Regions:
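Nucleic-acid nuclease catalytic cores
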Residues: 71-97
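Conserved catalytic cores of phosphodiester-cleaving nucleases, focusing on short active-site segments
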Residues: 31-53
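Acidic-basic catalytic patches of nuclease active cores, encompassing PD-(D/E)XK
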Residues: 1-27, 40, 125-127, 133-134, ...
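Basic, amphipathic alpha-helical patches used to engage nucleic acids or provide basic targeting signals
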Residues: 60-76
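Short, hydrophobic/aromatic-rich beta-strand segments within well-structured domains
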Residues: 34, 46, 68, 77-82
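Active-site-adjacent loop/helix micro-motif of nuclease/hydrolase catalytic cores
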Residues: 26, 53-64
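Intrinsic disorder/low-complexity detector
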Residues: 14, 32-34, 53, 98, ...
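Helix-rich interaction surfaces within compact, conserved domain-sized segments
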Residues: 66, 97-138
Length: 138
């Protein structure tokens, strides 16, 4: 079975092509937009961001299963976040039990709600001035 070719063309193509030569049983993933949210050097969440026009993603896919297991083993909540082009909406999905403690079910949030959530998982409240003016549209 052949390994899928590099699709985007903007990653380090040489390494991507080389790794694919290592075979089907040596899978790896270039995590396109994976964020490690942290506070004072301590990880607080892993978030996989996808643009609204990106292909659908499934938590059952081996790539997601590896990411979920990584978070669970590290005792870090893992979320998927699909965002609109204008950042007016973030569809958040908790992917492991630790994430479900913070957010029991999938939820659509405004940018303000999402930013507030990110502050809250760090134990903080966002400063009021953060939402003033042009910094963050509401």
């Amino acid at each position: 079975m052949d390994v899928r070719p590099e699709r985007s063309g903007w990653r380090d193509l040489a390494l991507s092509q080389r790794h694919r030569k290592w075979g089907w049983d040596c899978p790896a993933v270039d995590l396109d937009f994976l964020f490690l949210e942290y506070d004072k050097g301590e990880p607080v969440a892993i978030i996989e961001y996808k643009h609204e026009r990106a292909s659908p993603q499934y938590a059952s896919h081996p790539t997601y299963q590896a990411m979920i297991r990584l978070g669970t083993r590290a005792n870090i909540p893992v979320f998927a976040a699909r965002y609109k082009d204008d950042f007016s909406d973030f569809a958040i999905v908790p992917l492991n039990a630790l994430a479900q403690e913070k957010l029991p079910d999938r939820k659509n949030m405004t940018e303000r709600e999402w930013v507030t959530f990110l502050y809250n998982i760090r134990g903080y409240t966002p400063p009021d001035q953060l939402f003033d003016g042009a910094k963050i549209k509401i």
